[in-house]
């Protein structure tokens, strides 16, 4: 049994590793998009204009309230009806990026809220504009505070990248499904998939824990 498993694992691993490459592409692409959009939602939520704040809250509540898989289906299957056709990989990145942007927005919001108001008032008394206060004071402090939850969000996104398999993105889970169907070697295939996900997520988990310990000392 162990020998059979190793033989099959050696045969299947190159196929699954191609899926790993796509998983990394989806995760990194969606992560970058989620950071940009999350920062936008967070800044809109701090706007002095009430309509802008309402738009931010509405977007966050709507996106958070709709399952990720439905958002992926909408991007991949519905947007083409409006003339915007995307390939599966792009749809997966956009769908996951939008879905996770609301969590990134909360990370940024918590970071902004952690900034001591006295520091902001001191900066204003020195004649700094609101833009400079945001760029030179609030953003660096907010990012520092948001780093640990940002790491946890990245780990969740890595695992949820498997949902992109539902729109035929050939990431790790999809590659494994096709391999299992064609070979009937379910135990070998899904064991390898689990091991590969752990190999990607555990280093991130350890890095987040290390970062949290360092932040706690400061």
Regions flagged by a language model, labelled:
Residues 1-218:
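Transmembrane alpha-helices and adjacent helix-loop boundaries
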